[in-house]
Amino acid sequence: METTTPKSLYMMTLGCPKNRVDSEVMLGTLRHRGYTLVQEASDAQVIVVNTCAFIGPAKQESVDSILEMAELKKSGACKTLVVTGCLSQRYGEELSKEMPEVDHFLGTSAYAQIGDLLAAEASPRQVIPDPDYIHDANTPRINSMPKYTAYLKISEGCDNACAFCIIPTLRGGQRSRPIDDIVAEAKQLADSGVQELNLVAQDLTAYGHDLPGRPKLHDLLKALVQVDVKWIRLHYAYPRIFPDELIEVMASEPKIARYLDMPVQHVSDKLLLSMKRGRNSEFLKGLLTKLRERVPGLVMRTSLIVGLPGETEEDFEMLKEFVKTQRFERLGVFQYSDEEGTAAYDLPDKVPQKLIERRWREVMAIQKRINREQNKKLVGKRLEVLVEGPAPETEHLLVGRHQGQAPDIDGMVYINDGLAYPGEIVTVEVTEAHDYDLVARVVERPDPKQREHTARDAHPAPLPVAAMQRPAPRAE
């Protein structure tokens, strides 16, 4: 027997954009069943915490968030607390014993069952099947990003066996979506007003090897550029498989953003071998050079890990020199987290935590100088910017992003002079540079026909901004 009374729902999402997509599928599924989405957890009868368990700090954040939401069962309207995602997949059985206040634990392949689970009067407390699910274009989904941008998950799981990574255990082997299904969802997003598609997967460049006919990422991109969006951005493109055909599509198709998120993790051959990355430093440097040469204006984001077991001072100096030489426009640095169940967990020569933190600070300081120098070179330049809306700090500024700035993880462009609709792609002139952000003025807006298309569901009039108001620089 199923309950039919509509309930209020609050969703908390932790972790990566791929996890966000899972949350959006749950939101769509539950709204389809009559649930009302609320902005405050204290107003919700049902709270869902979609967790991350990639590294130690992420696990702790997930546990803290669950406990925070559990307090609302005592004092607020919450009647049902559901924990989903990677933490449930990894520790669901243990957590069910330690957290009696949680009603249900769903693994990474069970989130699509959440509607049936909540509708039934009697349902299991743990639903943690082997990870084998991925949604399709027919699955209800609510885009939780600003309506002009969206993540598009093209595959789930990973067939790599990187020594430091627990993801294949949590998410299963690679499962690619067929090209026509991905294109169908992309069209749905475009019809809803999305201007920017951010392609995500555990391993973007391995796309298709598990499908009949073994299509490649460049085949998918050739199909996606036919969709009515302005930018298509590539995230998590592993360097191990990077054919020339992919580089050619990136260089020749205007809709493919001049931006690439490609995690290299380290440059020491000894550590790359122990990490099981499948490529050496010579290959990585050659690929980076090829990308810079063949894709003019490419903004490169990468991620590195410091403190891997066996990382010596010589290895670390090599890494710092690599960062100085390559001058990545965007860089994320992770402190190694010793995760039980990974190959690296059993490696000898662990690096002390204080030393890991020192190395992290050193690399970030180098990158901060690089960011500042690169941003200063943009002053006086003209850029195309996707306007997102009023700045969080003040309604007298607009914020947006140029092609070299991905949502959530990179800097912003603050617009302090001109008119623009949220969702418009406008031409700006950069007037000021900070370490991570830029300040600019609008110099050209789209033609009226495009303006009508992008603003159809936005504001009734373009948003003005006060001339020459400066945003406060961000501390990062």
UniProtKB/Swiss-Prot annotation:
Binding annotation for [4Fe-4S] cluster 2: C158, C162, C165
InterPro entries: Elp3/MiaA/NifB-like_rSAM, Methylthiotransferase, Methylthiotransferase_CS, Methylthiotransferase_N, Methylthiotransferase_N_sf, NA-bd_OB-fold, Ribosomal_uS12_MeSTrfase_RimO, rSAM
SMART domains reported for this sequence: Elp3
Chemical reaction(s) catalysed: L-aspartate(89)-[ribosomal protein uS12]-hydrogen + (sulfur carrier)-SH + AH2 + 2 S-adenosyl-L-methionine = 3-methylsulfanyl-L-aspartate(89)-[ribosomal protein uS12]-hydrogen + (sulfur carrier)-H + 5'-deoxyadenosine + L-methionine + A + S-adenosyl-L-homocysteine + 2 H(+)
Gene Ontology cellular component terms for the protein in this record: cytosol
Highest taxon, organism lineage: Bacteria
Radical SAM core domain mapped to chain residues: 144-373
GO biological process assignments: tRNA modification
Protein name as catalogued: Ribosomal protein uS12 methylthiotransferase RimO
Source organism: Myxococcus xanthus (strain DK1622)
